[in-house]
């Protein structure tokens, strides 16, 4: 199996928000979203349990610029060799439900009588969420993604529905003939590209293309793709397809 990734080194905090020369890191959200869509389909096709972290189902980026005086993660208040880290609060910001409300639907705009609120307080503004929500959260709100058939939220819904339908207790995984390395640095950030392609015991197959060249898909019925295929029906880079093999 794959080696364990040390959590302390790779999962606890955001990396590379400033380059070594102090300039701002270029965040390509369009490319990141494309890769995230491909990654979740590959993950959900694998045997075993799957975990979805808050906001992944919306394609919600981490909030990396929370003001220091509004952070809650103890990491932000600990100095190690004169270095300060913001911690993981950027992943804990209350998610957006409704685009047109003050707290994006996370909490009501005004207080209601009951549960510690007396009649004299009813109608007063509610407290702010425990972490600040940026205005761009409106673009990822559930009520907006709900009506967009191509949104990340609806991709998750389709994928989880198909996973429930196609998941088999047989955890056998067989590599397909199209599973191969490209043999050249045409993958993300100059890594070797290629295709990861496998099938489950019941004929459910997943193909993910990491290389620059579009990949041929095996014969069968396409169940779901993370993004558009090429005009001739091949799988572009950073895209996953689920197929019911013929």
Regions found by a protein language model. Name each.
Residues 1-220, 226-246:
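Active-site and adjacent substrate-binding regions of carbohydrate-active enzymes
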């Amino acid at each position: 199996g794959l080696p364990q990734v040390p959590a302390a080194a790779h999962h606890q905090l955001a990396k590379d928000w400033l380059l070594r020369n102090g300039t701002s890191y270029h965040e390509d959200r369009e490319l990141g979203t494309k890769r995230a869509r491909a990654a979740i389909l590959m993950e959900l096709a694998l045997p075993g349990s799957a975990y979805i972290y808050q906001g992944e189902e919306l394609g919600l980026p981490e909030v990396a610029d929370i003001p220091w005086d509004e952070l809650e993660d103890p990491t932000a208040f600990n100095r190690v060799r004169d270095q300060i880290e913001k911690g993981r609060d950027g992943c804990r910001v209350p998610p957006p439900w409704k685009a047109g409300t003050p707290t994006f639907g996370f909490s009501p705009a005004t207080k209601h009588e009951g549960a510690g609120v007396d009649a004299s307080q009813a109608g007063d503004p509610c407290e702010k969420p425990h972490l600040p929500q940026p205005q761009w959260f409106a673009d990822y709100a559930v009520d907006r993604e709900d009506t967009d058939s191509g949104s990340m939220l609806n991709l998750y819904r389709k994928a989880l529905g198909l996973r429930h339908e196609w998941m088999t207790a047989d955890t056998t995984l067989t590599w397909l003939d199209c599973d191969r390395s490209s043999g050249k640095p045409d993958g993300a950030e100059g890594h070797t590209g290629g295709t990861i392609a496998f099938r489950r015991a019941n004929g459910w197959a997943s193909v993910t293309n990491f290389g620059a060249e579009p990949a041929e898909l095996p014969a069968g019925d396409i169940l779901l793709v993370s993004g558009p295929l090429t005009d001739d029906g091949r799988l572009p880079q950073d895209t996953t397809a689920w197929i019911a093999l013929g």
